[in-house]
Amino acid sequence: RRSLARLERLINAESCLVVDVEGQQIMALRPNLPVVPASTMKVLVASVALEVLGPEFTYKTKVQGIQDGGTISGDLYLVGGGDPVLVSAQYPTIEPLPTFNGTSIESLADALIATGVKSISGSVIGDESRYDSERFTPTLGLGIRMTEVGPLGALMINDGVVTGNPIKPDNPALAAAQEFTNILIAKGVNVSGAASVGVASSDIPVIAEISSRALPDVLAEMLTNSDNNTAELVLKEIGFSSVQQGTRLAGAQAMITK
């Protein structure tokens, strides 16, 4: 306690409360002073996610379409399941804080090709309908948007970046559809149309699907890298799993009640 007390002179007009694992107070300095919690909230998000989603939870990303032999007749739908660590092989090599425990988007392309697909007569359509379309938390400053977090969506590859494009698109689902199109073309699949966005009908067959690593591995990436995108998407998944609403507010409400 004496050692911790010496830290008081290093803390300005802020608030600090230290407790042990049993919830017993060790040190307090203006504990009732409201302050912005910042990234410490990620610990709470991780804790509630493990309770609501469970440690065995995995994110699913799938492709849907009408397959006729080696051809997808019409559009191929790339359907996002909220996976915040869905990345191409190249992306972690260019990140300041490389994504680890990621889900390989190339593995989905390989799974599709393994079914015999050689061409798509339409376009790759990005479907982000699992979550809402709120790209940023309204209170975020302009210095944080696009760089530290967002734009957000249930379908994001490489944090919404298209490899080779220095400008991050406003629509992460469109960026994901473009990235997946590029990957398919590089693997020898002919794609006739330009990438776009839309919603897959429930009666369109699932052709291939991939899963992320188990939730604790995703949360490890979030906490180690202090990954804002991962935290925001995990919060939306908490909302979706709790009340079928993939929104920030639904996720926050679930956290309050847990």
What role is predicted for each listed range?
Residues 14-15, 71-153, 160, 188-189, ...:
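Mid-domain, small-residue-enriched loop/turn segments at the edges of structured enzyme/sensor domains
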Residues 51-66, 188-197:
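Short, well-structured active-site flanking segments
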Residues 37-55, 124, 155, 179-184, ...:
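Active-site SXXK
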Residues 12-14, 30-32, 38-41, 56-60, ...:
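Extracytoplasmic
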Residues 1-34, 55-56, 60, 107-117:
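Beta-lactamase-like hydrolase cores
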Residues 161-258:
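A small/polar active-site loop signature that marks catalytic segments
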Residues 29-31, 75-81, 135-142, 202-215:
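Charged, often glycine-rich, active-site loop that binds/positions anionic groups
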Residues 50-53, 98-101, 119, 164-172:
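Active-site loop and adjoining helix of the penicillin-binding protein/serine DD-peptidase-beta-lactamase fold
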